[in-house]
Structures are given as structure tokens and as C-alpha cells.
UniProtKB/Swiss-Prot annotation:
Belongs to the FARP (FMRF amide related peptide) family. It comes from the Eukaryota. GO terms for biological process: neuropeptide signaling pathway. Coiled coil: none annotated. The modification Leucine amide is found at residue 11. Keywords: Amidation, Neuropeptide, Secreted. This is Extended FMRFamide-9. Its main location: secreted. It is found in: Secreted. GO terms for cellular component: extracellular region. FMRFamides and FMRFamide-like peptides are neuropeptides. It comes from Lobatophasma redelinghuysense (Gladiator).
């Protein structure tokens, strides 16, 4: 997803 470090788990 988008947001970077906040949602990197959703690559």
C-alpha cells in the first residue's frame, strides 16, 4: 500500500 514505514507490511 501507500504510506511507507506505516504500512510497509502491505508490500
Amino acid at each position: 500500500g501507500h504510506g511507507g514505514a506505516s504500512n510497509y507490511v502491505r508490500l
